[in-house]
Amino acid sequence: MNKLAVTVWNYKGGVGKTTICLLLAQIAAQNGLKVLAVDLDEQKNLAETLKLSSHMFPSIEVRTTLNDNYADENFNFYVIDTHPSKDETIKRALKFADIVLVPVLGDYNSLINLRSVLDYIYNSGVGTEQAVLVKNCMTKTKLAAEVEKVLDEQHYLVADSLPRSNLLAKNIASGNNWDKFMRANQKAQFIKLYT
């Protein structure tokens, strides 16, 4: 069984790590993958939200403990939500991943911390081809344009910008399917991240 592990990390809080994990888990489940969502954040937002929506997606299983053999035999898509810090747990999650998604906002703190975030990822043993920046909720401000410019100049791997969506957040928080009531063009932007 082919497996793919995605870790979503940034040591800045509030950048959309959990939302991206929830989105990936639900889309993967809709595409027939057996999803293991791992919540390493002490706030447990990923686990709590998945408990609400697990009845809708039988291929998303909520467990509090797991042994390695069970995980290897029963899942083919791993999504790992992380806490905003730098520690050994984070290093292990980064090393485990086939892909590391790094949500980046169009703000000053994202810009000044970007190099430090990527250095930490690369120093944890993640290759440059594995780390993908996700432009999350970029607004049309001068600062956001500066962030975009830096991303382009540095030749980082960058996913298309995810739009701010109150509907996405509301659907996920209420345990509904992520795309409930969304127009097709809205859905397409989020599905592109998954593919």
Annotate each PLM feature.
Residues 1-5, 194-195:
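Acidic-aromatic/histidine active-site loop/patch
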Residues 5-15, 22, 26-80, 84-91, ...:
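P-loop/Walker-type NTP enzyme "switch/lid" segment
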Residues 34-35, 78, 100, 128-131, ...:
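Hydrophobic anchor at the start of a short beta-strand
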Residues 38, 81, 101-105, 131-136:
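Conserved beta-strand segments of the P-loop GTPase G domain that flank and frequently precede/overlap
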Residues 89-108:
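Inter-motif core of Ras-like GTPase G domains
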Residues 112-128:
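Conserved C-terminal guanine-recognition region of P-loop GTPase G domains, centered on the G4
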Residues 137-179:
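Beta-strand-loop-alpha "switch" segments that mediate conformational coupling across diverse proteins
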Residues 175-195:
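NTP-binding/hydrolysis catalytic cores, primarily Walker-type P-loop NTPases
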